[in-house]
Amino acid sequence: LRLANMPDTLRLVAKYHEHQEKVMKKTHLLIIDPQNDFCDIAGAALPVAGANADMQRLAAFVDAHAARLDDIHVTLDSHNPVDIAHASWWVDSLGNPPVPFTVISQDDVIAGKWRARHPDAQARSAAYVRQLSQAGRYALLIWPEHCLIGSWGHNIQVDLMGALNRWARSRMEIVDYVTKGSNPFTEHYSAVKAEVPDAADPSTLVNTRFIDTLARADQILIAGEALSHCVANTVRDIAANFGDDNVRKLVLLGDCSSSVAGFESLGADFVTEMTARGMRVMKSTDY
């Protein structure tokens, strides 16, 4: 190759790389709360029917498409025993705690039906349920203690954990783990922000690093538990921060996510809402 031809050669190389960047789309996999406590297996605190099979299908998907997955993000529900959505936080007029799946409304707190067990937390707890109501968020629901930090229930489902580690080793990449839920004064369904953000706690505010990382992807595959709650809220918040033009990047792997029993309509409403905005839904086996 003569030196005189070098500028033309460099231009051709630059055009080739520009073309490759356009052709080689970045694909990210977002896995929401794939933890033992949400799987329908022995010992789970809050089992979601079908979740274990969801995670097994997802593990097979990761193994089958490892070379096509440029980044994997895994959110982890991470709670303390003492939490505003746990029974130990509240008592009735007789001093009894609520049973799991009790709904505590603003009117209930005003009427004295429920109060914070610790007197110092009463004003903030009352303000919390009021803010939920004003913002049109889910009503406060008392959940069984789940995904306690450091517990077996907090761990990732075993088949998926193996697949994630195989992906990391084969690609020489690090799985991006995103924790949420350790602030006891607010629920944190969404991995993007808490139900009622706490200005004094950055972990409850919009996770701009997470959003910015996802924004660099051309396609974001979504899976995890539960479709009705943490998946729905996370994806809605991602879409709100992306803008409508980028919602088309989102692809829900419909056979890798299930709703909490009794809340199936929330999951269905979420899918209807987001597909109308451009999100696609497909089976992991059709990818």
Feature roles, as predicted:
Residues 182, 226, 285-287:
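Short beta->alpha linker loops
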Residues 162-214:
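Histidine/lysine/aspartate-rich catalytic loop segments that bind and position anionic ligands
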Residues 43-50, 141-151, 183-203, 217-225:
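Surface-exposed cleft-lining segments at the edges of enzyme active sites
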Residues 16-178, 215-216, 236, 240, ...:
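Active-site acidic carboxylates
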Residues 79-81, 225-231:
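Gly/Ser/Thr-rich loops at beta-strand to alpha-helix junctions
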Residues 5, 9-11, 15-16, 20:
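Short, positively charged and aromatic/hydrophobic N-terminal segments
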Residues 220, 226-229, 256-260:
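Short Gly/Pro-enriched loop/turn and capping motifs at secondary-structure junctions
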